[in-house]
From Swiss-Prot:
Species: Bartonella henselae (strain ATCC 49882 / DSM 28221 / CCUG 30454 / Houston 1)
InterPro entries: Aminoacid_DH-like_N_sf (IPR046346), NAD(P)-bd_dom_sf (IPR036291), THF_DH/CycHdrlase (IPR000672), THF_DH/CycHdrlase_cat_dom (IPR020630), THF_DH/CycHdrlase_CS (IPR020867), THF_DH/CycHdrlase_NAD-bd_dom (IPR020631)
Enzyme Commission identifier(s): 1.5.1.5, 3.5.4.9
GO cellular component: cytosol
Name of the protein in question: Bifunctional protein FolD
PROSITE patterns xref list: THF_DHG_CYH_1, THF_DHG_CYH_2
GO molecular function (one): methenyltetrahydrofolate cyclohydrolase activity
Keyword Ribosomal protein among record annotations: no
Similarity-based family: Belongs to the tetrahydrofolate dehydrogenase/cyclohydrolase family.
Gene that encodes the chain: folD
Amino acid sequence: MNNIIDGKKLAEKIIMKVKAETTKLRNNYKIQPGIAVIIVGNDPASQVYVTSKSKKAEECGFFSIKHMISKETQEKELLHLIATLNSDPQIHGILVQLPLPDHINTNRITQAIAFQKDVDGFHYINIGKLAANALEDAIIPCTPAGAMMMIEQQCGQDLSGLDAVVVGRSNIVGKPMAALLTAANATVTIAHSRTRDLDDVCRSADILVTAIGRPQMIKKDWVKNGAIIIDVGINRIAAPEKGVGKTRLVGDVDFEEIKEKAAAITPVPGGVGPMTIAMLMVNTLKAAARLHNLPIPKF
């Protein structure tokens, strides 16, 4: 169906531009963007994510380094590593793979990263810049940035007159997503687990972004005809049709039910996921340009 938004295809276009801009930086200024990824412990899902991020960085022509450290690592040791990377001129982006072990304070770690190198966009300074609509100067969290690019592809950059509903209020997706939609002149509602009549709220949306981590919660009768649906949820459910103990990935939206009704919809997998990694590359490239006081590439 031609209303399915192909995240892989859009991400590939972005990566092609990142490669071209990286080549310009290297040829014109002798600068190679550098990213450091830190993973604490050996969680299999985290290992997969980190490997894919590192491979994509190398594909873009970045200097990429992985720090894989024991789950017994103490917080002060991790803080020391971050301080070292903060002062390393070869590194323009620092990413700590979440979740962290329970004995490490996640907030303390994310705030220890220099805001100029905070390519996840989690530092309070970057959050504040986004809230203040200083988008040119902020590092924007990767998933909302990628989702917003998909929305712009469908609706253009000015969302005046459109009602947007964001289901989920996390600092990683929900809140920054709402800020980006507001900056684009949409009328925005943030809904969450405590929202009364959530189905009615969702039905009001011209643009519906879901980030709640509830498999296939959003049903066909929750969505208006012709809505744009961006499904950020990644949920693993049993797939007995594949065999005993097998699973499959689904979003927060019942995709098969809703795809005929939506004007455009992202699949899971293959929707927002590839865009998240592409925007991490964009953030690293922009951070390198900004740290060297060079013009910031446009995407």
